[in-house]
């Protein structure tokens, strides 16, 4: 009876070692779970970014207002008969506002 008990105990020790430290054990399981959680967070950020870009694409494809707004803001384009004015603050005011932003 003693040999059978020792054999079963040895098998139990080996199974416990495999469970905790072996390939695909508890340590690997927790590491993979952490990797999956990090990847899901990254995927959520990228999905939000993609949704925003698709919304902008739909807006650009469907509406003239978005095209006109981008043309005016980014390319400084105007309609015939319009005059484009860009208001630039004085250098002293720009320095003051930059100094306040750094505080």
UniProtKB/Swiss-Prot annotation:
Gene Ontology terms: biological process: cell division; division septum assembly; FtsZ-dependent cytokinesis
Coiled coil: 31-71
Membrane topology annotation: Single-pass type II membrane protein
Ranges that cross the membrane: 4-21
GO cellular component: cell division site; cell septum; divisome complex; FtsBL complex; FtsQBL complex; plasma membrane
Record-level Gene Ontology MF annotations: identical protein binding
Topological region Periplasmic: 22-103
Knockout mutant characteristics: Mutants form long filaments, but DNA segregation is not affected.
Primary site of residence: membrane
One Pfam family it belongs to: DivIC
Leader sequence segment: none
Keyword Cell membrane: yes
Motif (Leucine zipper-like): 41-72
UniProt-annotated location(s): Cell inner membrane
Subunit structure and binding partners: Part of a complex composed of FtsB, FtsL and FtsQ. The complex can be formed before its localization to the division site. This tripartite complex can be divided further into a subcomplex of FtsB and FtsL, which forms in the absence of FtsQ. Also interacts with FtsI and FtsN.
Function field: Essential cell division protein. May link together the upstream cell division proteins, which are predominantly cytoplasmic, with the downstream cell division proteins, which are predominantly periplasmic.
Cited PANTHER family: CELL DIVISION PROTEIN FTSB
Family statement drawn from the similarity comment of this UniProt entry: Belongs to the FtsB family.
Name under which the protein is recorded: Cell division protein FtsB
Organism: Escherichia coli (strain K12)
